Amino acid sequence: MVNRKIPKIRFKHFGDGWKSDKLGNLGTVARNKRIFKEETSEVGEVPFYKIGTFGGKPDSFITRDKFEEYKSKYPYPKIGDILISASGSIGRTVEYQGEEAYFQDSNIVWLKHDGRIDNSFLKHFYAIVKWQGVEGTTIKRLYNKNILETPITLPSISEQSAIGSLFCTLDDLLASYKDNLANYQALKVTMLSKMFPKAGQTVPEIRLDGFEGEWVEKRLKDISKRVTRKNNDLVSERALTISAQFGLIDQEEFFQKKIASKDVSGYYLIKKGEFAYNKSYSTGYPLGAIKRLDKYENGVLSTLYILFKAVDVDSDYLAHYYESDKWHREVSMCAAEGARNHGLLNITPVDFFNTRLVVPKELEEQRAIGSYFSNLDNLINSHQEKITQLENLKKKLLQDMFI
């Protein structure tokens, strides 16, 4: 008896049951002819993708003569075929789009099928597939048998095409948002480096229209006030940490557990809009990180942090200034080479507040710069949120539109 099923979510005009089958009944596993190392070079005419460069940038090439010979004599993917990684991170996929390329035998394979399955449907089936004989094991290889014995439940070819088309549209939308996000993030990095003066200069390389004149040098102590209030009355029990992406964030939200001591009455109490300097250095943060609390009304931080609030400077300007690396030179001069203790820079509050920074003389320009970067952050955040929403939608639809 044929096992007939239907998914939870379905296009209205389809009503037939789905049929259970195996990939091996639909086709065979194909692969390119083996290429030996001595047949490749670091530069050449046709890219040769190994498992380590699959889906990325090639680092090996073969001659056009070899490519044309092997393409004509041995199996080669058709446009639309879904290539699969059979070793390492098994099951990664790349849709072959007709480009001139050759792929490492046995490590990169595809299902050469008879047309009873739509490639766009197959591509997204691979996103949720449980390979036969692999699940729950430590096997890091996908053998032909694993692929061919894997069960699949199929609707009609027209319904497969409709489902595949929907997910391809979602993928295109996700790719568009991710490209835009990368562009906005790159723009921010560039503008952070160019909209604040370089060391020894008093005018930035790029300046907003309508402003002129030299910027002025200030010491941090002249434009801010140190915050040393303790959490004596347990106003807050939200222990914070500094994250590159999220700034000051709840430890439990970030680490999925609380790192701080159970008794946080001796911690500093930081309020929304105030800044914290974490002297702990790490990859990408050679001199620690300075972030403003924006996410919550208050929180607590270890007394190893240095806290302050903006007084005679626009707070948004200061927040984005400390996202750049323009303050690194001053702090590095205070923290002498080798003066590091258990992952912390050995810099005193007095030295920290004596660091110099250059700011626009006019408050209006400070605000304009702060507003520029805040708007850019809003664009970045909205794209990140949209990507998360689309990824969650795709995950849900994959669960409910396949069997």
Model-derived segments and spans:
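DNA target-recognition patches
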Residues: 24-27, 37-68, 228-260
